[in-house]
Regions:
Chain A
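Gram-negative outer-membrane beta-barrel transporters
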Residues: 706-709, 728-823
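Periplasmic N-terminal accessory/gating domains of Gram-negative outer-membrane beta-barrel systems
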Residues: 119-148, 185, 209-211, 223, ...
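Short loop/turn motifs that connect adjacent beta-strands in outer-membrane beta-barrel proteins
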Residues: 289, 346-347, 362-367, 386-389, ...
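N-terminal periplasmic "start-of-domain" segments of outer-membrane beta-barrel proteins
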Residues: 21-26, 48-62, 149, 154-156, ...
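C-terminal beta-signal and adjacent terminal beta-strands/loops
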Residues: 804, 813-830, 847-851, 855-916
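Surface-exposed extracellular loop regions of Gram-negative outer-membrane beta-barrel proteins
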Residues: 488-490, 536-547, 552, 590-613, ...
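Face-selective signature of the C-terminal outer-membrane beta-barrel domain
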Residues: 429-446, 458-603, 702-707, 748-756
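Outer membrane beta-barrel strand-and-loop segments of large Gram-negative receptors
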Residues: 509-513, 555, 563, 673-679, ...
Length: 916, 378
């Protein structure tokens, strides 16, 4: 014991270094003194020998040996005596002690205790719970069974990377080993799975906004290593953050844009309100029809072809107040992912894009909150831990924009109007164990408008979901999700009691998803699973809204359908440079009764006059089934770690359609499920791209080109009545669409100046090629779609003067969208009327807008009770009256031409944000 | 219903937006298309107006002439006579025969046009023509109530003609005659005054109604005209004559589309304008666009008067017709500066007022009094 203590200070490492250069000696000694013996050995081998001379001055030694290691030779000399030889390899020292041996290293058990499981198991070994989170860069962590006799070639290392301060998992961090370039990116749960050679390894970890770090591991077998990373706070030096850029070049997916909330917070938007949807619209390939549009168009797709998911719930109307604000509280959003081209096999049901918005988990370490006050909206967020394993977030947002209506002129008659919205979020995250995690999310939003005590209009989004994540072993994980989505709107009038009415629409969905990810071998990762959604849609209910109203009650039959899919996808790394992603998704859609429907003469367009039979479907009986496979393929060839080319092809189908005859997503658009008369929409996209990063991955560039076709896209007929139409199939036509384009993007995400510039050229056209149509639009030729804007240039940039002051600017330029204009006029019924051109033959003037904002963070002390941020800016700096539409109105029987702009002048704003 | 929804959205946009006059450039004009406004009425009143579309920049309309007939499907043809260039009427009395359909037939510039054969419709009597003061918008709403027991769904069109007496706010005893260059006395008992005038107007757009959404064919209190505050219609006596026509569903859809194309297209949620096909075709070239819809129906007329003192809220108040000025060099000087005589006589200096306060011709009126006007104002 004393010896141990005595030599403790000499011990620096618990590892013995094997392989130190060892000298071999030869001895031929006869009856020599200890001193002579020692001298010979020391001379030949370089060792130093220690002893208590008093013990051996009377001894004489004889030893013969040839090419022996010094310790062995010395031991031979003392054989049969009471002396023992101890070796201290690290220092090339030998000790000769009477009847005792010197312990020259601390026992392996000294620092930790290991539980031994049965040998030969591939399960990992639990470290002491104290050691679960690897927080030190210098400590070497042992993974696996150290006492195993054989080391495997490859070892599977898994774990979760989380934020040191809040305990939240970190998404998109890259952990890799430099020499073999074996790497992995953490998924949505911060989970990574990495295959490495056994032995001593050094792993580098990079995460956006986090300090670059490393971990040392000694790998004996498969094991787990959870890592906590520190946030990179207030460092004035440049930070080399490469995870995002590596991710883009390395991944097989094309047309994917990932953004973290930090990227979103600095982009100036109208009224200083951080807006997730507006940021999405700044990305190349994403267009909108105009500033008041609540929908967006991705690569030539219409607004209903985007699947918008918020914590797995489908959102039908992603904005508040006609597109001025997004429906997502930015304080709760963690990241957004927009899939424009390669849509992963686990998603389906829309043919143009998937926008996935994921909320954060609550802070697991301490209770915090944020309050934000802006010109038009305010929000509050509270979060914190509940016990050791649970965390929560509550968020709320509301508007008080009535004041802007109060500014309207008296004689507009709408001075006393009210427009408002609020939304509420509640998230609960519970970790049962390392293997099981439950995430529950609830969202509710409500918009209501009341202009002059007459028209009232409102809509509601409500979503609830529960997600259970289970890790079976280090190669198989699964997520099971279930939820309920609801969207409804209503409009009502009361002014004239005789025709006061109320119109309601609603859609409900119940869904369940089982998603598995299996890291079968280090070359193949399989994703497979099953999704099922039950739709229940009420297309319209029209009721009288006063006692004396003569309105007849009318209701369109409810629609029900079940959409079930199974999918299987394989990410196959054929060689480290070439990897492909192959996926198949098979969907079956069943339209369910009760329903009474008409079948029409197939040789003519469905019309009230040519129905041939009326069918009835029973309750929950399937009366029409559509089923087909969808293919998702993409491939990447990486010439080097910063240069790759990719190509992909996807087919997709959509079974729910928005029926609208307005250019933008209007509040009264109706949705319809496919049934016996409405076929599913089909889409096909092929795309290819070149991706190169420059200057040590600080600048990302990409060029992507695509070609898309759409079939059975629903367009409406002339004079169509789309509201409360019992036979809406008689007012719509199947149209074909095509879109193609090229997108160029340059992105810089570090340094004082960061942001992106993009240019896109694209065309989107539609054609009515159904031969049954008598008088097709544009005579059956291709005509421009409403959102066809060939040239588009976008710039979003942020310049940090210091850590406290930064300037943000964005510019948006695009060709004017197509419109249908009058081309001549005539007299009728005592007034002037216009005759319109073929659809979308002309364009409104080009669109250009520039916004600027200045962000100030008054104080940066980490230990202050509250942190605040002020943002001052101008929206539409140049004040350009970007035409939203051009039209003619008859005034007093004469026509006058007008141009309407949404934001016709520069709009300054101030917003204030406190975090506590 | 949708119209109101869209209008308030437009007004929200006004607060922070701009609606500015604009003329799109580079439009390929579709002038020269045939426009046919044709209504067959029994017993009298049939009228067909022919014209062509003109470019948006032009101002004058050119009527079209040719041969116009009404055909019945049992072989009778009725020729219409051209009363004015481009306007054709049926002089004689016309009676609809049982189970007979009628079509419009025209030969213009060597091209032969014919409409589809339509079944004549019978227009019901108007149940009530009423008016109400609308406090919120400070206007008078003129409303119609009607029902039609003969059909399942009723579609109506209305037209109106207004005549009203314009009374100047003040009676000027004299006026300056710029041609004779002298002062003339205004006489209340002869037309030689500027106190009483008359004006007229008529409907300039489609006024349509449908009972599709209602429990019966009754449409109650449908506003067909609005008298805004500040005009001269209710300065003394107002008369409106409303004509009602029954339409069928196709004609209604066609006209409603035409009206929407000039009414709702500007707003954010405007539906895309489209052109619907009418029911008149060029027999040799069915692809030729012909604008218009031939309708065969009957006409029901109803009228009413509204007196100014029935609607005191509509009297123009707080105007500057209270200010009396005296310092002009003479009546000619006042006239040149836009002022007219209020009083003129020996003994006191003349008093002047803004011309439109003493002269009803400056308020949109003329001295042409309709023969049937029920009072003896001159």
């Amino acid at each position: 014991m004393e010896v141990k203590k005595l030599y403790l200070s000499l011990i620096l490492l618990t590892f013995t270094f094997v392989g130190f250069a060892q000298q071999k000696i030869s001895l031929n000694l006869n009856q020599v003194t200890a001193e002579e013996l020692f001298r010979q050995i020391e001379q030949q081998s370089g060792y130093t020998i220690y002893c208590n001379p008093a013990d051996m001055d009377s001894l004489l030694f004889s030893v013969q040996c040839v090419d022996e290691l010094a310790p062995q030779a010395l031991a031979k000399a003392f054989e049969g005596t009471a002396f023992q030889v101890s070796v201290y390899e690290g220092k090339q020292q030998l000790f000769v002690l009477k009847e005792r041996s010197l312990v020259t290293s601390i026992s392996d058990d000294y620092f930790y205790q290991r539980k031994e499981l049965e040998r030969g198991s591939s399960d990992y070994y639990l470290l002491n719970p104290m050691e679960q989170k690897a927080t030190s860069e210098n400590k070497v962590y042992t993974i696996g069974d150290e006492t195993a006799t054989t080391l495997p070639d490859k070892v599977q290392l898994t774990g979760v990377i989380s934020d040191f301060r809040t305990g939240e998992p970190i998404v998109g961090a890259v952990i890799y080993e430099e020499t073999t370039m074996a790497g992995a990116t953490t998924d949505a749960y911060g989970y990574y799975s990495l295959s490495l050679p056994s032995g001593r390894q050094r792993l580098l970890i990079r995460g956006l906004g986090l300090k670059d770090t490393q971990r040392q591991v000694q790998l004996y077998g498969n094991g787990k290593l959870d890592i906590e990373l520190e946030e990179e706070v207030y460092s004035l030096k440049e930070v080399t953050v490469t995870s995002e850029r590596l991710a883009r070049v390395q991944s097989t997916a094309l047309g994917v844009e990932r953004m973290q909330i930090k990227d979103i917070k600095n982009i100036p938007t109208a009224f200083g309100e951080m807006d997730v949807i507006k940021v999405v619209m700044m990305l190349p390939g994403v267009k909108s029809v105009g500033e008041a549009s609540s929908g967006f168009n991705v690569r030539g797709g219409s607004t209903d072809q985007n699947l918008i998911l918020y914590n797995n719930g489908t959102i039908y109307n992603p904005t508040h107040l006609f597109g001025f604000f997004s429906a997502f509280n930015p304080d709760l959003v963690k990241e957004i992912e927009l899939y424009k081209s390669s849509i992963p096999s686990k998603y389906g049901g829309r043919i143009s894009s998937v926008l996935e918005i994921n909320a954060r988990e609550g802070n697991k370490k301490e209770f915090t909150g944020q309050v934000s006050i802006g010109l038009l909206t305010s929000r509050v967020t509270l979060e914190g831990p509940i016990g050791e394993k649970t965390s929560f977030i509550l968020g709320g947002r509301t508007t008080y924009s009535d004041w802007i209506l109060g500014m309207l002129p008296e004689d507009s008659g709408y001075k006393d109007g009210k427009a408002g919205f609020y939304d509420l979020n509640a998230i609960l995250d519970h970790k049962f164990s390392d293997k099981d995690n439950l995430y529950i999310s609830g969202y509710y939003s409500n918009d209501r408008f009341r202009f002059d005590s007459d028209e009232r209009y409102g809509y509601t989004n409500a979503n609830a979901s529960a997600k259970w994540r289970h890790i079976y072993n280090n190669r198989l994980t699964s997520t099971m999700t279930g939820g309920y989505d609801h969207y409804s709107y209503h409009t009502e009038t009361r002014e004239n009691p005789s025709d006061a009415y109320k119109l309601k629409f609603g859609i409900n969905q119940v869904y369940g998803k089982f998603d598995f990810t299996s890291y079968i071998t280090d070359k193949h990762t399989l994703d497979f699973g099953l999704n099922s959604t039950l739709y229940m849609l009420s297309p319209g209910t029209y009721t009288p809204n006063s006692d004396s109203s003569l309105v007849a009650r009318d209701q369109i039959q409810d629609e029900r359908a079940l959409e079930t899919s199974v999918y299987l996808a394989d990410r196959w790394e054929i060689t480290p440079k070439l990897s492909i992603d192959l996926g198949v998704r098979y969907t079956m859609f069943n339209a369910l009764g009760p329903r009474t429907y008409t079948l029409y003469d197939p040789n003519q367009l469905p019309d009230e006059t040519n129905g041939i039979s009326t069918e009835e479907a029973g309750d929950w009986k399937s009366f029409k089934t559509y089923h087909a496979p969808e293919f998702r393929l993409s491939a990447r060839y990486a010439f080097s770690s910063d240069f790759s080319i990719k190509a992909g092809a996807n087919t997709l189908r959509q079974y729910i359609h928005k029926i609208s005859n307005t250019t933008v997503m209007s509040p009264t658009d109706t949705w319809k499920l496919s049934d016996a008369n409405i076929k599913p929409q089909k889409g096909l996209q092929v795309a290819a791209g070149i991706y190169k990063n420059f200057l040590d991955n600080t600048i990302e560039t990409s060029i992507e080109g695509y070609y898309k076709t759409m079939e059975d896209y629903l367009d409406y007929r002339s004079g169509a009545q789309l509201i409360m139409n019992h036979h809406i199939e008689t007012d719509v036509i199947s149209t074909t669409g095509r879109a193609y384009g090229v997108e160029l993007m340059l992105k810089k995400t570090q340094g004082k100046l960061n942001g992106w510039i993009s240019y896109a050229y694209s065309k989107t056209q539609l054609r009515q090629d159904d031969p049954r149509v008598d008088d097709p639009i544009n005579n059956g030729d291709w005509y421009n779609a409403d959102y066809d804007k060939p040239h588009e240039f976008k710039f979003a940039g942020n310049y940090k003067f210091t850590q406290r002051y930064s300037l943000s600017m964005n510019c948006d330029y695009s060709t004017g969208r197509p419109i249908t204009v009058p081309t001549s006029k005539y007299q009728y019924a005592g007034g002037e009327y216009v005759y319109y051109s073929e659809r979308n033959q002309y364009r409104i003037p080009d669109f250009f807008r520039m916004d600027l904002s200045f962000n100030i963070e008054p104080s940066h002390h980490l230990t202050l009770l509250t942190h605040s941020m002020i943002s001052i800016g101008v929206y539409n700096l140049t004040g350009r009256k970007n035409a939203y539409s051009v039209y003619y109105v008859a005034e007093g029987g004469r026509l006058k031409g007008y141009k309407m702009a949404i934001f016709g002048s520069p709009i300054p704003y101030v917003s204030y944000n406190i975090k506590f | 219903m949708k119209k109101k929804l869209i209008y308030w959205i437009v007004f929200l946009a006004i607060a922070i937006s701009c609606i500015s006059p604009y003329e799109p450039q580079g439009i390929e004009s579709t002038e020269g298309l045939l426009v046919v406004e044709a209504t067959l009425l029994a017993p009298y009143g049939t009228e067909v107006k022919l014209s062509r579309t003109i470019s948006l920049n032009d101002m004058t309309y050119e009527p079209v002439s040719g041969e116009v007939k009404i055909l019945s499907d049992d072989g009778v043809a009725y020729r219409l006579t051209e009363t004015e260039k481009g306007t054709y009427t049926l002089e004689q009395e016309f009676v609809y025969r049982e189970n007979v359909k009628y079509a419009l037939d025209m030969i213009l510039d060597g091209k032969h046009y014919r409409s589809e054969y339509v079944e004549p419709l019978r227009t019901p009597e108007v149940d009530a023509l009423t008016w109400k003061y609308n406090e919120k918008y400070e206007q008078v709403d003129i409303m119609v109530t009607v029902s039609n027991p003969d059909v399942d769904v009723a579609y109506y069109q209305w037209k109106f003609k207004e005549n009203w007496e314009v009374r100047a706010p003040n009676f000027g005893t004299h006026r300056w005659d710029p041609d004779a260059r002298r002062v003339i006395t205004n006489e209340l008992d002869t037309p030689n005054n500027r106190y009483y005038c008359w004006a007229k107007d008529s409907s300039r757009h489609f006024i349509l109604g449908s009972s599709e959404k209602f429990i019966s064919t009754t449409i109650k209190d449908k506003v067909i005209n609005e008298i805004a505050y500040g005009g001269s219609r209710l300065s003394n006596l107002y008369h409106i004559s409303v004509k009602q026509y029954e339409l069928d569903g196709e004609a209604y859809s066609y006209f409603r589309n035409l009206q929407n194309n000039v009414e709702t297209t500007g707003s954010i949620f405007a539906p895309q304008p489209t052109e619907m096909k009418g029911n008149i075709n060029n027999l040799d070239n069915p692809k030729e666009t012909v604008i218009g819809f031939f309708v065969a129906t009957t006409e029901i007329t109803i009228e009413m008067y509204i007196e100014a003192n029935e609607v005191p809220e509509m009297q123009v108040r707080g105007s500057d017709c209270l200010e009396v000025l005296k310092d002009f060099k003479g009546p000619q000087d006042a006239y040149d500066q836009g002022y007219g005589i209020l009083t003129y006589g020996i003994g006191a200096p003349p008093e002047y007022m803004l011309m439109r306060c003493v002269d009803c011709t400056r308020r949109g009126g003329t001295k042409k009094k309709p023969e049937w006007w029920p009072n003896d104002h001159q």
